[in-house]
Amino acid sequence: MEKQKYYITTAIAYTSGKPHIGNTYEIVLADAIARYKRQEGYDVFFQTGTDEHGQKIELKAEEAGITPKEFVDNVSGEIKRIWDLMNTSYDKFIRTTDADHEKQVQKIFKKMYAKGDIYKGHYEGMYCTPCESFFTESQLVDGKCPDCGRPCVPAKEEAYFFKMSKYADRLIDYINTHPDFIQPESRKNEMMNNFLLPGLQDLCVSRTSFKWGIPVDFDPKHVVYVWLDALTNYITGIGYDCDGESSEQFNKLWPADLHLIGKDIIRFHTIYWPIFLMSLDLPLPKQVFGHPWLLQGDGKMSKSKGNVIYADELVDFFGVDAVRYFVLHEMPFENDGVITWELMVERLNSELANTLGNLVNRTISMSNKYFGGVVENKGVVEPVDEDLKAFALAVPGKVAEKMDKLRVADAMTEVFTLFKRLNKYIDETMPWALAKDEAKKERLATVLYNLVEGITMGATLLESFMPETTERILAQLNADKRTLEDLKTFGLYPSGNKVTEKPEILFARLDLKEVLAKVEELHPKKEEPVEEAKEENVIDIEAKPEITFDDFGKLQFQVGEIIACEEVKKSRKLLCSQVKIGSQVRQIVSGIKAHYSAEEMVVKKVMVVTNLKPAKLAGILSEGMILCAEDADGNLSLMVPEKEMPAGAEIC
């Protein structure tokens, strides 16, 4: 029977510079999903690549004194090197400077123009060069790009436009009837409430103010807008031809099963891209997942901030699979994850060296010490064995459930619960005590067999996340590679097999002080100018009348998670947020528009007064109050929980 196909893509990496670990997280996440789908029996096609056109690259190349093509060749090569270093199993690495891609983009643009979806006009507005994005004045936040926070520049030029509004209602209907199309749910609410429902403006899809792009073949002074160019890689990379000569591969693979992208570019993938596909009369991808960011400390990694950590540097310290473990295991499903050198060392020492590495080492060492490395199932079973067996057989199903929902971090946690259970089994059975009694030799053999079998099952489940570690474990145990189907049976390890004589250390423990000293050598901290001591900034406010504890007790404070937010039209101050509080969703209107954009508010955890009597602000019902602090200059700051807390948690 022919295998069911599974087509997965990452966003293609922009070739403005070397990718940091935050960029690298996405390719590793996609690789884990692709590998697991292969384990499940799917015929997987995994595509990634590089996005190589645009004004930003033209300027970078000019600064470097080389041509744009030379510049992107260098950066694309560096990106591919790091993707390969991280042991990612992609099937296609596409470059938007590939001749066949450029040819198809020109044909796609021409087809959209002939269909009447693209027309010629003049663009006047604001442009963010780093994001390659257009904005109106009203979309800017404090005069800056709402996506990256950097300055925008005025742009006025002849341009071609795409009629986005023509397909808006159709896209809204599609999203409403396909609940899994945009995930997580909070991203869908953001796109609907902030962009689609307020109404789409036509999109500028060409530029004349720079040359580094794909020329519009019937009007070559124009180059195709970088996002129209980049997004089409998902179809050109598998052989799409808009003249009807698409490849057999395209006909097999499209629509994509999963576009895996960063949350910062979800608008392009869930609004622009579906509408482009509708224009081409092509089906839409089955799912777009906007993953969170991997932050350094408490901020998004950025070269301009000087807080960048690179994947190859981490690999030099910890090894490939330890880095894969960290970025996959430490990233929540929706909220941003955090990476620090300290946390990496702690996880390596506790989870990898101790929980996993020590388990494998002890098991092999005891097998050699007591039985010369021979592992035999003598069948001397006790209730603790049945408990272990039931536990081990349940784990694959739990992993499958998590992976089906793209909860990769949770899936890894399930795998490590098996390793922890095996460590507990050692404590329960005490092989060293059994070894002292010759009459219990067969019981000891059974215990060690169960350990080897359990580790083999765990190593099989670990393969999608840490493939090299799986190979090393199986080699030391002299165990054959297994399928997920095999994991429905406990006891497939051949009785009488012999494990390796000297166990290899999977993960060596590291000393935090030594690691930090080496990091300091690698990235010396810049000395910041010493500022004169300033008088402490304090604010005295007029005291309000005292209240009793009973009065205060009437107020109810809870943690709320903002799942959607939009500007209140005709108001300069108000934002309207949909706030999840426990199992309920409340609508709350807040006067914070001057301090936070609607996009910034989404996914934030805030403190809310939840038992205020509902009131109308600007004609909109508000069902609570989001708490803020205000300084002497009138600047507002949201009050947020110091630690991760669930939506609905009581504030007391």
Predicted regions and their residues:
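Structured secondary-structure scaffolds
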Residues: 1-48, 100-104, 154-369, 411-415
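A glycine-rich helix N-cap at a beta->alpha junction
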Residues: 76-91
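Cys/His-rich short segments
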Residues: 115-168, 172
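Phosphate-backbone binding interfaces of nucleic-acid-interacting proteins
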Residues: 531-652
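Beta-strand segments within the central parallel beta-sheet cores of soluble alpha/beta enzyme folds
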Residues: 287-290, 474-476, 576
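Intrinsic disorder at enzyme termini
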Residues: 470-551
